[in-house]
Amino acid sequence: ALPICTMNSFVTIGQCAITLIDTLNERIGRGVSWLTLAIVLVTVAVVIFRYCFNLGSIAAQESISYMHALIFMLGAAYTLKHNDHVRVDIFHHRFSKTTQGWVDFLGTLLLLMPVCLFIIISSWDYVSDSWEIQESSRNSGGLPGVYLLKSTIIIMAGLLFLQGISLAIKSLFSALGITPNTES
């Protein structure tokens, strides 16, 4: 169960938001990480069936691509939570904690969040058109539900936006010298 927070101050509200968002993205990230094992197992099965039994499956081959996409799309916010995205750090590490907090806060508000909103807005018609026709694979024997996979574009941007809220709050706390009591 997600933690329950009481809201009686700015810091407490911030801590609550951080905890809820970080917990959500942690669970999603850990969940989709198991897809890497599934990719390996399905790939091995596809190879064995193809070369040992001369049997092929378009659906199995497509499922590998679907799982790969899910790992990246649903794991992006988890990666941001753990600060594991590629980052060119020329100056940031030399700044004081306060300055780092302000840089991260402004970067989140001025770069990450607008990009997430742009992705959601610009992909909305693309995804809704796919839903409208219940798009499925173009290949005979392929997987149905391409529209579900395309929906992860919006979900990814939404999860990144939420994680951006958590990051912005953490950065603002750092910039203001506030040390919240969060376990995430």
Give the role of each language-model region.
Residues A1-I4:
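Short, small-residue-biased leader/transition segments that mark boundaries at the very start
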Residues T6-S184:
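Alpha-helical transmembrane segments and membrane-interface helix-loop junctions
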